[in-house]
Amino acid sequence: MRLQLAVDLYDLDLSLTPSFVSSVYERKAKGEWVKVAGYLSGKLMIKQLKPSKLLIKCLTDQPKLVKKLVEYELGLWHEPFEHGLDKLPRSVRSVLVKLASAYPGLRLPISYRDQFYIFVAVVLSRRANYDRWVLKWCKRIWRLYDGRLEALINADRSELTRIGSSYQVMLLPTLLKGLLEAVRCLGGLSSFLKLDPNLARALLIKRCKGIGPKLSDSFVLSVFKAPHIIPCDVHLVTVASRMGLIGEAKVKLPSKPLCSKYVCSEKASSLTRLPVCPRTSSCVRSRLQRMVGELGGWLQTITYLHGRSYCRTLRPKCNVCPMREDCKGRP
């Protein structure tokens, strides 16, 4: 089956590369990806023919199903985030417009079929380079345990060393078991995915040992339609601080004890019946959510890309940074 999709302001490589959904794909060439794990593994190929057109090839004759899957997994379920920039506060709008122009066409892929695969990639990413280590570990896991979650949970140390010897790999069975137990208490994965994303986030943090705010946010952002979710990492804090997005007052990162029982806003509180966090005024996640709203996940992804390429914590590339004129932290 061949299918062509018209797209507006979209970049396939820029959208998939930083996303955890990329863990079930493999980039074959510029603008060309094939699915290597999960649903339609080995049957789906996607290529960006030109800025306004994608080519989809799939070894199944179910065009409606494939189109829906592709729209979710490529981030096409949401309009270009650039369209929402004019609604931002004037104090940050010009900086974010310029930052967006450096990374045009970025969307947020989500997976509604391969949630356990995404969870594996997310938990492996804790303090690990995604491109160098996580993708390599994932490929080995897909090859050895593809679709057999119980076998991975019950794997002993000798089996796990076939994947890697890092603590991230060794902890994987325990974290997967915690996720399964958490979703079973709710009636299964389908029931979990029907929860409000803010509540799902809090439940993961509360019930899954070893899962804190960053990992929970990363998972929810990758499997729910929840573009406001902001995983807080060093790139986000560094870039946001240097660009003047979070003010001069010192901010705090989200914490597991608070995030397991509170939410960041009155709106989230009304949807989840959880109280508003007492730290909202000083928490970087809450502060940025109030500022950018639905653009939260998009902003986090852009700061990840920008932080990795230019705005590094150590030895930043200020002399070639496209944002150097707007940076309040450059020497």
Could you describe each region identified by the protein language model?
Residues 1-331:
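HhH-family (HhH-GPD) DNA N-glycosylase catalytic core used in base-excision repair
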